[in-house]
Amino acid sequence: MNTNIDNINEFIRKTFDPLTTRKESFNIRLNYKEYKLTISFLQNNYILFTCKSNFDFYGNSLHKNDVNNSFQNIENIPANVKNDIISLINSNNLSIKEFLNLNMIIICLSEKNTGDTIFEFFLNKLNEKTMNNDVIKMLFKKKENKQEDEYNKIINSNLNTLETFNRMYGLSIKGNETEINLTFNNKMNKSSPLLKITTKGFLLFCKNKFLNLNKLVLKNNEINELNILHNLDTTNLKYLDLSGNNISSIESISDLNFPKLEKLILSKNQIKDVIYLKNIRAPILRDLDLSMNQIQNLDVLNSSSWPHLKSFDLSYNQINSIEFFKNASFPILEYLNLNTNLVKNMEPITHLSKLTILILNQNPFSQMDFLPKCDFKNLKEIYFYSCNITTVQYLQNAKFPNLITLSLPENNITYITTLRYVNFPKLKKLSLYGNNIEDITPLQYANFPSLLELYLYQNNIKNISCLNQFKFTKLITLSLMSNQISDINVFKNTQFNFNLETLALSKNKIKDISVFSDYSTISFYNLKELWLDHNEINNIDKLDKAKINKIVRIKLGHNLIQKINVFERMNFFALAEIDLNNNVISDLSPLVWIKLRNLKKIHLANNSFIINNNNYALNTLNNKGIQCILQSEEEQK
């Protein structure tokens, strides 16, 4: 966007200095096209968002015909509003006291040559309280040694472009204005009254305007009904976001016509009844988001048809039955999110053959007995976080040839015996953390040839000797944190060593880590992250010989390490961060000879050394550009 900065500064100066000329329009260039921007003040209690004819203020008067034209299509505007406009224009002695009482800003953008209005925005509640808002203070500053009425000096050095001005007021200008964004949740302080939109009395649209409007964002305001849209031409609207408001009823949505609407977002409201969606006139709707409401009953949508719907988000509601899916039509539904509801029976969705992502987290169905009945040939991701599941036996008969992610964390699974019979040839991510699993040997028989990530942390695993039988040769992430593991010698000859990038063994009972430096160990050629913190390690003397040449971060905090002489010999070219917090290190002098040219951070908090006795080592590291962190994360906060 090319903008004439001098014109903007001159304009703002004139607009906010009540003692100067009444001309309140200036020219700008927007996307290589010329426009005219007009801002003015008047006194009333309405917010209007219209596209009525542009009116310009020249000199001290405004022709009556212009006024009439300006309001010819606006409904419910009191006569005193028109009088306020004329009074403002004709006034030659507007004082700061009157200025502080003004509570409306008009912002009007029009094409320079044709005079056609691109948009017009009315902002209410500009009063003395508003003037104390941080955003307003950024614009004006009282001149030194001057009277109170001279709040006209611009002090915000960042207010150099129209984009900045727009962002401050939550506006979005894009060429011929096909998008309107009135999000309250912007960079302004959330206590600001500037962009609070409530009922239709405060948000009025002019009929038959914005014919090219295809995106409307009104999220995070105080809208409580959909009647505010009744005067808006929705013929070309493709995207409508009303999330984060106070909408409890969507009854009027069936009166609206959305022939081209593709995405409707009604999340974070107070909607309970969705029956009116059954008759919504949105024939090509593809994405419907009803998450974070108070919906309980979906059966009212029985026999409804959603021929083009691809994404349906019902998460974080109080839904206890999804029977309506049996009789409703979702021929191409790909994404279904039922996260955090009260559904016990998932069988009604088994026929949704086009599903690619299914999220069933935190529902109390406890068993996956519906899986063998599922016609999910296209399914790529399925999530069962915290569903009280006790067995994985039903997975052996599930036919998911394209499954990539299987997530079963935070359940009550103890045995995974039947996983030896499971065949998911494209599976890349398996999450079984937060269960009660002790024996992982069945995984050595599972047919997961494409597996890249395996998460087994927070279980009761003690023995990992079966890892060398795992056929996951492509594995890049293995997490075994928070188990009961003490022996890790199996890593001498595990088949996935070469490709592994992250190995997490934190919070176990490991004492001996010599396996990493044993000459017979298969190289961890691509390993970048090695987590060994919160164990019982006291000796790292041979760590410099470890086959981890590409290592970037080593976590050794919360162990029993005393000597760190190994760092004199260590020469890992990519190593950038070492965590040695909470050990019993008393001497830092070996760090003086450190050769790790890419090392950026070394964590040394809560050790036994005395800082004054180790200043030379600390200063040497600092001179090499290595940050020595002597406080824990908690202390830093």
List each language-model region with its residue ranges.
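A structural signal for beta-rich interaction modules in eukaryotic proteins
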Residues: 7-125
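LRR N-terminal entry segment and analogous cap-like coil->beta motifs
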Residues: 152-228, 232-234, 238, 246
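Leucine-rich solenoid repeat scaffolds
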Residues: 586-637
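Conserved hydrophobic beta-strand positions in leucine-rich repeat
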Residues: 180-182, 214-218, 235-242, 262-266, ...
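Acidic, low-complexity intrinsically disordered segments
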Residues: 112-146
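A structural signal for leucine-rich repeat
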Residues: 202-209, 227-234, 251-258, 275-282, ...
